[in-house]
Amino acid sequence: MKVKDFDFYLPEELIAQHPMEKRDEARLLVLDKETGEIEHKIFKDILDYLTPNDCLVLNNTRVLPARLIGSKEETGGKMEFLLLKRKEKDVWETLVKPGKRAQIGARFIFGNGELKAEVIGMGEEGSRIVKFYYEGIFEEILDQLGQMPLPPYIKEKLDDKEMYQTVYSKEEGSAAAPTAGLHFTEELLKKIEEKGVKLAFLTLHVGLGTFRPVKVEDIQEHVMHSEYYKMDKKTAEIINDTKENGGRVIAVGTTSCRTLETIADIEGKVGEQSGWTDIFIYPGYKYKVVDALITNFHLPQSTLLMLVSALAGKDNIMNAYNVAVEKEYRFFSFGDAMFIK
């Protein structure tokens, strides 16, 4: 299967540049994965498609304001840092621009000097291993100095950092938001629970690999970047009980979906677990635990488009995407949603 098989025409004006003012009023395309039938709704209508036996699995990761603008200690030259992955307490794998100024031993200053950094090693694909020096709590300093690491296709500034966080975000560590979850409000989640639907939370810290293009022609040759995940005993029990009682396990977002499929055994059972996953789901993959998926509209030729094609069938997905373009749905991180049922 070739990468070009997952291409589609997307006019640039359909790439959403701002989050919706009211999260749950984005549009919702409902796709029946068996018949390919499509319905057009508003996100809050998701309630009508959930039944008391169902379980929604949500990723409670929180996006770090991981983009830092600083200067080189010796020269004062402007530098941009993007924190990718925590290696140990104050050591991060980081993308640094311009890279040529970030050799081992180079030192940098951020803000008024309350945060300093030194390159202590080279990482994968041109990244740098950076050690940070500061007094106080790193997350608080990052909150003051850092900016949200918005995807490259969002050109406009984000006025409110919280609009790029889900209302249930808790565990800090992501370089990007699990965007399907951005559509939920606290009120909508409450209504969902009142209907008898269980909410179960897991964590997957989204890495920047999520925006990296597939650079091989044959999709089977593509290698995913690994991302940290964890699921506790309580969540595992809710999911296993749902399956046993004939309910659906509905993943909110591709990150929840990939975590569930990483942890599930052949029989679709899950357990308390943490680790790193580089699972790559594409057509031909047989889902073990996920029955349905709430997700946004993904980039042409992306691994996430391949993941949804594995769940609903490539023809159904490509047809739904062409309909979404025709009906002017908003695409990508701040865009509209799709429910694959």
Curated annotation (Swiss-Prot):
GO terms for biological process: queuosine biosynthetic process; tRNA wobble guanine modification. It catalyses: 7-aminomethyl-7-carbaguanosine(34) in tRNA + S-adenosyl-L-methionine = epoxyqueuosine(34) in tRNA + adenine + L-methionine + 2 H(+). Keywords: Cytoplasm, Queuosine biosynthesis, S-adenosyl-L-methionine, Transferase. InterPro entries: QueA (IPR003699), QueA_dom1 (IPR042118), QueA_dom2 (IPR042119), QueA_sf (IPR036100). It holds the Pfam family Queuosine_synth. It comes from the Bacteria. It is found in: Cytoplasm. Its EC number is 2.4.99.17. One of its GO terms (molecular function) is S-adenosylmethionine:tRNA ribosyltransferase-isomerase activity. Its main location: cytoplasm. Pathway: tRNA modification; tRNA-queuosine biosynthesis. GO terms for cellular component: cytoplasm. Transfers and isomerizes the ribose moiety from AdoMet to the 7-aminomethyl group of 7-deazaguanine (preQ1-tRNA) to give epoxyqueuosine (oQ-tRNA). NCBIfam families: PRK00147.1, queA. Monomer. Belongs to the QueA family. This is S-adenosylmethionine:tRNA ribosyltransferase-isomerase. It comes from Clostridium botulinum (strain Okra / Type B1). The gene is queA.
